[in-house]
């Protein structure tokens, strides 16, 4: 069997560092799609970390082929020596629509994570100026958006010492949802106490895996 990819297909080629709670690019894209969000609708990630959800949402809005900027192993194989991958990439990029990337934003309390998010957005070939990022605590966050989505990957608290802090953050997400009743809130977590910590049951749930870690995707209308 011939490996034509090289690195796993989940690696799009724009991330240089994964942060403390890495979210696979393919899973981030799935979270955006499963939420029901459509390009042009407001989307804010209140725990954006290194920007994977924001980047995948922007690539989806633009209509960019996944992994277009990464190197594939088949590019070095003799059997593909007659293929001009540069032309293929140029043709794919010509089909993208950068003007469709709008109303996407993020925030996080960690300034280093935000700097990495900006780098990843640039390395994905996106214009970072149209994806505003803000350093702010979740409990202080207020966004000027309506009829849109909060989509996030909050910390899971896999270590017992972190659980109390993470569960307090889940309730902060509940309060954020209360402050923005017209925005749907979508969050993925491996913590079985998420709904109890949040403050109410989700309107929809979907079981997913982040690598080998079993998670649930909670959607609140």
Q: PLM features: residue spans?
A:
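Class I SAM-dependent methyltransferase Rossmann-like catalytic core
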Residues: 13-23
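Glycine-rich, histidine-containing beta strand-loop boundary motifs that form or position
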Residues: 4, 47, 189
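A short alpha-helix capping/helix-coil boundary motif
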Residues: 7, 95-98, 153
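Non-catalytic substrate-recognition/targeting regions of SAM-dependent transferases
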Residues: 1-15
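Non-catalytic surface loops within mature trypsin-like serine protease
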Residues: 4-6, 111, 156
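Short, flexible helix/strand-to-coil boundary loops that buttress conserved ligand/catalytic motifs
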Residues: 4, 118, 198-199
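C-terminal catalytic and target-recognition region of SAM-dependent MTase-like enzymes
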Residues: 134-221
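Conserved S-adenosyl-L-methionine
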Residues: 23-142, 158-159, 165
């Amino acid at each position: 069997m011939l490996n034509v990819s090289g690195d796993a297909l989940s690696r799009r080629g724009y991330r240089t560092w994964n942060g403390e709670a890495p979210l696979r690019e393919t899973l981030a894209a799935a979270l955006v799609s499963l939420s029901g969000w459509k390009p042009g609708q407001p989307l804010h990630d209140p725990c954006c970390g290194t920007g994977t959800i924001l980047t995948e949402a922007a690539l989806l809005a633009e209509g960019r082929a996944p992994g277009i900027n990464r190197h594939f192993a088949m590019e070095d194989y003799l059997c593909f020596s007659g293929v001009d991958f540069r032309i293929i990439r140029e043709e794919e990029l010509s089909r993208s629509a950068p003007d469709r990337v709008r109303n996407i934003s993020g925030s996080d309390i960690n300034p280093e994570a935000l700097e990495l998010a900006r780098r990843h957005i640039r390395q994905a070939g996106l214009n970072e100026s149209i994806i505003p990022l803000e350093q702010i605590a979740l409990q202080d966050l207020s966004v000027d958006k309506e009829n849109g989505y909060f989509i996030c990957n909050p910390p899971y608290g896999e270590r017992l010492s972190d659980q109390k802090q993470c569960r307090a953050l889940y309730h902060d997400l509940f309060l954020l949802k209360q402050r923005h009743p017209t925005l749907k809130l979508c969050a993925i977590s491996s913590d079985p106490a998420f709904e109890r910590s949040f403050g109410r049951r989700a309107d929809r749930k979907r079981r997913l895996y982040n690598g080998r870690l079993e998670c649930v995707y909670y959607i609140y209308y």
